[in-house]
Curated annotation (Swiss-Prot):
It comes from Salmonella choleraesuis (strain SC-B67). The lineage of its organism: Bacteria, Pseudomonadati, Pseudomonadota, Gammaproteobacteria, Enterobacterales. The gene is bamA. Part of the outer membrane protein assembly complex, which is involved in assembly and insertion of beta-barrel proteins into the outer membrane. Constitutes, with BamD, the core component of the assembly machinery. Its main location: membrane. Residues 1-20 form the signal peptide. It comes from the Bacteria. PROSITE patterns: POTRA (PS51779). Part of the Bam complex, which is composed of the outer membrane protein BamA, and four lipoproteins BamB, BamC, BamD and BamE. This is Outer membrane protein assembly factor BamA. GO terms for biological process: Gram-negative-bacterium-type cell outer membrane assembly; protein insertion into membrane.
Length: 805
């Protein structure tokens, strides 16, 4: 039977009504053109079923419903008697998505944006959405000043109704700012105002912040900077009237004109506080005091609002509202500030939760909390918990989130979200210098053993001059009050002459135990006991060694000697760094010392002081200045000298970079008859034949030391934002000296420097790169000594794993 077909609808739903009001009864529904979409799925999306009586409106609704599924780019509905024939053309399926020519936008970011718009491999292609994406990407390029950019979507058909989608980018070049004009300024010059902008029409070579490339977002920030500049100086009526951005015909240049009205300067006449102050009116009034005749300052007003919110937050009012309304009196040029405060409800903490701590146990994090469950919410206590977690050094990032409990008017949960870092490290170091050659060191350290917070270290060194092993364990919470307990045992076989030090061998072993007592949030006192056995041999007589032996009642030509010492160890630590892992703000001071106690063969004391201060110079803490110092002093007691093997040394990656480790400071002056190792090429003699002694390049250290360093940390070039918190670049200037306060110049040959002079300061400068790698912290440094003395040994390139600062 010839099929009688009637076209009743199309893509634009523009067909005429042909059935009349009564319509017809559908006895069957057939589809043509389905490939990927199942018949059942298509039927479910239709409002019409077999047996329904349909009219023109029902058919139009059917077409709309099928289009709404997003699976079809064309739909036609035909009638064959009482059968509906639905002809569809499915949208093609995306088989692959590729990008070409995109440099400013990474592939991953493009994929995320496409997926957010429903464009992904395996999904059907919506050409309308594709056009919107093209326009959106071009708008993005325009916003960053690339006005010649274009984005085209190239769709290549494939068999089985599939397509390849390729986005082709022509980014062009960024339009550069030719001139920035500010019209209407009288109190301040245009140059002064523009000097605070990120966008510039001229950028000196030394300015690493300014940028001539136009970006819409940066312009918005600069306009806000301009507004704040005037409001902070009393111009309460200041207004930006308009902003024009003009493009040159070749789309490579930008002219920016900002029209402003400065107005007059206004002074504050008073501050009136009203509203629900939750019983803290006296404290709030202290925060709103102003000096008589003080200029209106927008930043101070904002800070005052924030201070009031913080004050109320400390008492559990988590969501206070503080609004300041300036009342401007144009007659006498004054502003009265009306501050309305609504403290809101007082909130209590139901639970404290931790997220992201896959290795660290909850108890390790919970013991750092100062906010208690069941107590009212204290914003300062929550922040203290965040600071303490950061200072542990276990985490790359720590964030807090205060979540309201559903159905409760006054309860919240506090969530700490942490991102753990690798707290274990291989302490492996390599150094190379023109004189020293290659040197090695190794060890293993785990600062968060099995997630318990215990610090466990197994360190060992094996090279031509030393065999060293150490096991150390520290429990930071030996008691619930935070008293720590640490201990270690060690063995050391040290051939000093092979290490470019004075000639002797020391085999030592010992142990110590230390308790740490937290005084407050930032201060800790430590006290402990130690024991060490030193067995000296192969000692070649030299002046510093002779002084020590004589003070111990030994002959100057003694070649071997043993001593057992018991010490009282003490220390104090002040730590207010923002985090233990790559700090960017705050200070740390560490004082350590020890003194021998009765029962010891030696009688002496030693004190060391280390300080580090980080000062960020931008709001994002990406540019940081670091100042470090290290001081040390020791001396004998009861007429005895401090053992020469306890001397301080300087030089190397942790003190003065660019110098070989431990080589700065006094050198050995060997006595008559002293013999050196014939394989030792560092000395210019085999046997000393001068009665006054022979100088050498062998370092002996000193009983006093001073080291300082100034470091400028910058963002690391070519590093993505993902790794910005794991890599640190710095330029440094190191200086330091070691001296012997007991040195007598008259006891040495005339060609020997005065080693009691602290003014023999060494200096170096260079660049360093630190990377928190999966193996632990890696430190690369290159330094050039520019002030050194005879006998000093340079080591320009140094590389270490396991040391950061």
């Amino acid at each position: 039977m010839a099929m009688k077909k009637l076209l009743i609808a199309s893509l634009l739903f523009s067909s005429a009504t042909v059935y009349g009001a009564e319509g017809f009864v559908v006895k069957d529904i057939h589809f043509e053109g389905l490939q990927r979409v199942a018949v059942g799925a298509a039927l479910l999306s239709m409002p019409v079923r077999t047996g329904d009586t349909v009219n023109d409106e029902d058919i139009s609704n059917t077409i709309r419903a099928l289009f709404a599924t997003g699976n079809f780019e064309d739909v036609r509905v035909l009638r064959d008697g009482n059968t509906l024939l639905v002809q569809v053309k499915e949208r093609p399926t995306i088989a692959s998505i590729t990008f070409s020519g995109n440099k400013s936008v990474k592939d991953d970011m493009l994929k995320q944006n496409l997926e957010a718009s429903g464009v992904r491999v395996g999904e059907s292609l919506d050409r309308t959405t594709l056009s919107d994406i093209e326009k959106g990407l071009e708008d993005f390029y325009y916003s960053v000043g690339k006005y010649s950019a274009s984005v085209k979507a190239v769709v290549t058909p494939l068999p089985r109704n599939r397509v390849d989608l390729k986005l082709v980018f022509q980014e062009g070049v960024s339009a550069k700012i030719q001139q920035i004009n500010i019209v209407g300024n009288h109190a301040f010059s245009t140059e002064e105002l523009i000097s605070h902008f990120q966008l510039r029409d001229e950028v000196p070579w030394w300015n690493v912040v300014g940028d001539r490339k136009y970006q819409k977002q940066k312009l918005a920030g600069d306009l806000e900077t301009l507004r704040s500049y005037y409001l902070d100086r009393g111009y309460a009526r200041f207004n930006i009237d308009s902003t024009q951005v003009s493009l040159t015909p070749d789309k490579k240049g930008i002219y920016i004109t900002v029209n402003i009205t400065e107005g007059d300067q206004y002074k504050l006449s008073g501050v009136q506080v009203s509203g629900n102050l939750a019983g803290h009116s006296a404290e709030i009034e202290k925060l709103t005091k102003i000096e008589p005749g003080e200029l209106y300052n927008g930043t101070k007003v904002t800070k005052m609002e924030d201070d009031i919110k913080k004050l109320l937050g400390r008492y559990g009012y988590a969501y206070p509202r503080v609004q300041s309304q300036p009342e401007i009196n144009d007659a006498d040029k004054t502003v009265k500030l009306r501050v309305n405060v609504d403290a809101g409800n007082r909130f209590y903490v139901r639970k404290i939760r931790f997220e992201g701590n896959d290795t660290s146990k909850d108890s390790v994090l919970r013991r750092e909390m100062r906010q208690m469950e069941g107590a009212w919410l204290g914003s300062d206590l929550v922040d203290q918990g965040k600071e303490r977690l950061n200072r542990l050094g276990f985490f790359e990032t720590v964030d807090t989130d205060t979540q309201r409990v559903p159905g409760s008017p006054d309860q919240v949960d506090v969530v700490y979200k942490v991102k753990e870092r690798n707290t274990g490290s291989f302490n492996f170091g390599i150094g190379y210098g023109t004189e020293s050659g290659v040197s090695f060191q190794a060890g293993v350290q785990q600062d968060n053993w099995l997630g318990t917070g215990y610090s466990v270290g197994i360190n060992g060194t094996k090279n031509d001059y030393q065999t060293y092993s150490e096991l150390s364990v520290t429990n930071p919470y030996f008691t619930v009050d935070g008293v720590s307990l640490g201990g270690r045992i060690f063995y050391n076989d040290f051939q000093a002459d092979d290490a470019d030090l004075s000639d002797y061998t020391n085999k030592s072993y010992g142990t110590d135990v230390t308790l740490g007592f937290p005084i407050n949030e930032y201060n800790t006192l430590r006290a402990g006991l130690g024991y060490v056995h030193n067995k000296l041999s192969n000692m070649q007589p030299q002046i510093a060694m002779d002084r020590y032996l004589e003070s111990m009642g030994q002959s100057a030509d003694t070649s071997s000697f043993a001593a057992d010492d018991f010490t009282f160890n003490y220390g104090w630590t002040y730590n207010k760094l923002d985090r233990g892992y790559f700090p960017t703000d705050g200070s740390r001071v560490n004082l350590t010392g020890k003194v021998t106690i009765p029962g010891s063969d030696n009688e002496y004391y030693k004190v060391s002081l280390d300080t580090a201060t980080y000062v960020p110079i931008d709001n994002d803490h990406k540019w940081v200045v670091l100042g470090r110092t290290r001081w040390g002093y020791g001396d004998g007691l009861g007429g005895k000298e401090m053992p020469f093997y306890e001397n301080f040394y300087a030089g190397g990656s942790s003190t003065v970079r660019g110098f070989q480790s431990n080589t700065i400071g006094p050198k050995a002056v060997y006595g008559y008859g002293a013999h050196t190792d014939p394989n030792d090429n560092n000395d210019d003699y085999e046997a000393c034949t001068q009665s006054s002694g022979c100088k050498s390049d062998d370092a002996v250290g000193g009983n006093a030391m001073a080291v300082a360093s100034l470091e400028f940390m910058t963002p690391t070039p070519f590093i993505s934002e993902k790794y910005a918190n794991s890599v640190r670049t710095s330029f440094f200037w190191d200086m330091g000296t070691v001296w012997d306060t007991n040195w007598d110049p008259s006891s040495a040959p005339s060609d020997v420097p005065d080693y009691s002079d602290p003014g023999n300061i060494r200096m170096s400068a260079g660049i360093a790169l630190q990377w928190m790698s999966p193996l632990g912290p890696l430190v690369f440094s290159y330094a050039q000594p520019f002030k050194k003395y005879d006998g000093d040994k340079a080591e320009q390139f140094q590389f270490n794993i396991g040391k950061t600062w």
